[in-house]
From Swiss-Prot:
One of its GO terms (biological process) is positive regulation of translation in response to stress. Its main location: mitochondrion. It is found in: Mitochondrion inner membrane. Keywords: Membrane, Mitochondrion, Mitochondrion inner membrane, Transmembrane, Transmembrane helix. This is SLC35A4 upstream open reading frame protein. One of its GO terms (cellular component) is mitochondrial inner membrane. It comes from Homo sapiens (Human). It holds the Pfam family DUF4535. The chain crosses the membrane at residues 62-84. The keyword Mitochondrion applies. It is a single-pass membrane protein.
Length: 103
């Protein structure tokens, strides 16, 4: 009888931990899926955009390592805090509009 009393809280703890693990797994899958857009373009990845921004900063400044770090951190922060537009798609649409000319 004593084993039954001890096993019930352990079972509840295991069920709680299982639910937490499933929740974490769903969150990670959602974040991974949102990292690269459905169109499959690499430039839609916020990490890559930050890395490219860091590369540009590194080319403009002498300290390449600092530029990479600042650009990558800035890209990650911006992607998490703001709705970052898809620059590649916007530029492509704009260039197509310019090629067509006025209606």
């Amino acid at each position: 009888m004593a084993d039954d009393k001890d096993s019930l809280p352990k079972l509840k703890d295991l069920a709680f931990l299982k639910n937490q693990l499933e929740s974490l797994q769903r969150r990670v899958e959602d974040e991974v899926n949102s990292g690269v857009g459905q169109d499959g373009s690499l430039l839609s990845s916020p990490f890559l955009k930050g890395f490219l921004a860091g590369y540009v900063v590194a080319k403009l400044r002498a300290s390449a390592v600092l530029g990479f770090a600042v650009g990558t951190c800035t890209g990650i922060y911006a992607a998490q805090a703001y709705a970052v537009p898809n620059v590649e798609k916007t530029l492509r649409d704009y260039l197509q509009l310019l090629r067509k000319g006025p209606d």
